[in-house]
Curated annotation (Swiss-Prot):
Pfam families membership: YidD (PF01809)
Record function comment: Could be involved in insertion of integral membrane proteins into the membrane.
Alphabetical keyword list: Cell inner membrane, Cell membrane, Membrane
Membrane topology of this protein: Peripheral membrane protein
Domain of life: Bacteria
SMART domains in UniProt: Haemolytic (SM01234)
Intracellular or extracellular location(s): Cell inner membrane
Protein name: Putative membrane protein insertion efficiency factor
Family annotation (HAMAP family): UPF0161_YidD
InterPro entries membership: Membr_insert_effic_factor_YidD (IPR002696)
Length: 69
């Protein structure tokens, strides 16, 4: 499950993200954060942390440096 999630995010990074341009307000980007969170915490908790991060990534949030806990 862990490797499937990472593969899906990597697929997004290489196939879709280049056409959308840089729009993430955070460092590391939301997709990098998702991969790091899944590697560090596993599929379920890491996936949940990644989803929460994507929900916080919008124009009205200041963004900035936000590492995986």
């Amino acid at each position: 499950m862990k490797y499937l999630l990472i593969a899906l995010v990597r697929g997004y990074q290489y196939a879709i993200s280049p056409f959308l341009g840089r729009s993430c307000r955070y460092v590391p980007t939301c997709s990098e954060y998702m991969v790091d969170a899944v590697q560090k915490h596993g599929a379920f908790r890491g996936g949940w942390l990644g989803v929460k991060r994507v929900c916080r990534c919008h124009p009205w949030h200041p963004g900035g440096y936000d590492p995986v806990p």
